[in-house]
Amino acid sequence: MEPGTRAKRAKMIETPKLTTDVIIRVWEKNRFQGIVLIDRKNPPLGLAIPGGFVEVGESVETAALREMKEEVGLEVQLVGLLGIYSDPKRDPRFHTASVVFVGDATGEPQAASDAQEASIYLLEEIPLDRLVFDHREIMLDFLGSPD
């Protein structure tokens, strides 16, 4: 094999786009207020867990923190990994793989970037039927997890 052939082939291979999402638990004076969901301003429209794409040269953790600041204006502390979601049909636009974290924050979310609105939902009031992508499955995993 010629030098550099493997690297050239790797550049030609189409791979899933890497994304990250964070289920943000909002706290006020050590009291749980709920989790943040955004109302998307771009298709597919509906409610979503805040998240976005990992940039080249960026770790998924760094991307998660950056996206939370950009999308909902919150400084988030990541507390754990919920899971990795990679069903090729999870995003109707293209194949993505998402690393989903749980994080804690204080304050009020402010819609920005891809968010038309950002709101705090009590766990029992999450409208699961309005969640886009595979976020219903992700939310059910979160709700069924201890903690």
Show where each model-derived region lies.
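Conserved Nudix-box catalytic region and its N-terminal flanking loop in Nudix hydrolases
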Residues: N30-L74
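Residue-level preference for beta-strand/loop junctions
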Residues: E14-P16, L45, R93-A97
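Short loop segments at secondary-structure junctions
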Residues: V26-K29, K41, D104-P109, L123-E125
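Conserved N-terminal beta-strand and adjoining loop/helix that marks the start
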Residues: R6-I35, V102
